[in-house]
Structures are given as C-alpha cells and as structure tokens.
C-alpha cells in the first residue's frame, strides 16, 4: 500500500527529510518555478543574515540585463535592447536599478560591469516527487540541475522497484534517488555528486525568491 496523492507524499517528506539531509539555516520552498518545470520542493542552506543585503527585489528582466553586462563587461543600451528584445524603456529602468545597487556603472554612452551578485544561499537541493512514472520524474529532476547543486527524485516506496532496477541511469545523469514509505522511512539509493548549476540566471532568480518571499 502506498500514498494516495503526490501531495501526501510531499507533505510527509517535508517532515522526514532531515533524517537524511543535515542542513543548517535551511529554507524550504514548495512548487518552485524558475523556467524549467515546477520543482515540488527546493531546500536551501542560507548564508548568514549579515551577508544578505536588503534592497528592492530584482526582476527577471533586471537579472537578464545584469548577465549581459557581466558577460560583455562593457555594452551599449542598443546592444542590450537587441539581445533581449525588450522595450528600451524597460531596459533603461533595469539599468538604473542595477546602477543604484552598484552592479553596473555608467561610463559615457556605455554600461560597465561593476560588482558581482552574491547569492543568498550556500547550496540548494531540488526534489521531484512522484507516486509512479519514475522516468518522467527523472527527466524533470534533471532539468532542475540548471539551478540546483543537487537534484533528486523522490518515489513512493511501494512503486519504486523499476526505478531501483535502473539505478545506472540515475548515476549517468547524476540525479539522486530516494524512496519514502507511508510511515516516513526514507531510503537513499543514489547520492549525486555536487555539480555546479548550469544557469547562473536561474540561480539568481532563486536567490531573489528566497530573500523576498
């Protein structure tokens, strides 16, 4: 006998996961959407509050503009507008905000990278929960590697046999595999290696969500 719903599984996992994951100063987010599906849970280890600068939240446009200036080091307004396809007035608004917060400097008719954005967390772990359909869960969890240091599939233990038999695929994709029983017992079948997230923009989006939720 297994769980009746995925939400039932997620709710119990939230209570029980600390037995397998020792994370200090943690924050737990549900239904996290950053552009590659919706992660059921994201658990982050926050930096000390003294390290987090309080300011107005950066939008996705602000972050995209920041990344362009950072990568190019020196860029004109027209180039940023062309790359993003966003209205010039919105780009100007983002650049003004980035200048105010010292991420960017104005130099004549150009914008120059100034200071690196500091993430609000030390690490984060994404979880995709499923009652069955382990292949679908695996592919979804793999997408979370764009922003997560670690990504896991969490399956109902009652329906996990096929996934366990295909453990080499989890290892190949570096996605962890956990099962949870209806009495809250979590078993870890594969612990992925820490891997640098693939998309800095998505990491920044998550960081902003954490600071301003």
Model-derived segments and their meaning:
Residues 52-56:
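Short amphipathic alpha-helical boundary/capping segments
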Residues 91, 137, 162-163:
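Amphipathic coiled-coil/heptad-repeat helices and related helical stalk/stem segments
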